[in-house]
Amino acid sequence: MIVNFLNYISETLQSPIIYEIWNIFLIDYCYLFYHYVFKIDFTNTARWFLLHSIVNMIVVYYAIDDVKLCIQNSSECYKMPWNDNSIKVYNYAFLLHIYHCVFFKLTKDDIVHHTLMVGICGTLCYLLQSILSSLALFFLSGLPGGIDYFLLYLVKKNKLKSIVEKNMYTILSAYFRSPGCILTTFIGLNGISDYYNNGRYYKLLLLISTLSLIFWNGQYYLLKSHESYIRKSI
């Protein structure tokens, strides 16, 4: 019985989702351990920004092959199923935000964001299981998020002026993140046409809902970044 139990624990720990949540926890623990050992003051906000930045860059690493596939096969990537890397991309992005909900204090904006983009859009992406989700997450969370959250971390550590971060994020949003969300939506339109013509209305509804949220997210946070920069500039 003990051997069977140990085998079960071993198999569970080797499952992708456990591996990824463990990695997120380990990154966070190393940050806490370092500051505790060397008695360095820190804020949970700075801790979250750095964790978010690191995990976002992990998302970029695993998403890059799917991004290439989507661009090279834009007419049919919406129906290409998840591969091992796609699962990692989804798990890291999804679990990071669950981790945020459990271990950090959320703002009202965080709650809205997590409800729409994690609770709803995350579920839709899981039901679709298309590599198109990797393309979306590359732009939604991956590269622009990895850069900006590191800049926000530097701001919290008084290594960078807030106005500089806001200016750089406005540029990232306008010329990379928002266009990337539009590109993802445009590529996904091929699937809408296909599913409608072939009467696959369940898939059609899932895809329309997912693409709508991706498009909205890109443009909404583009607007928010500009508003924030303008307020800081005045």
Please give the residue ranges for each predicted region.
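N-terminal signal-anchor/initial transmembrane insertion module
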Residues: M1-T107, K203-I234
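Multipass alpha-helical transmembrane domains of eukaryotic endomembrane proteins
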Residues: W48-G199, S228-I230
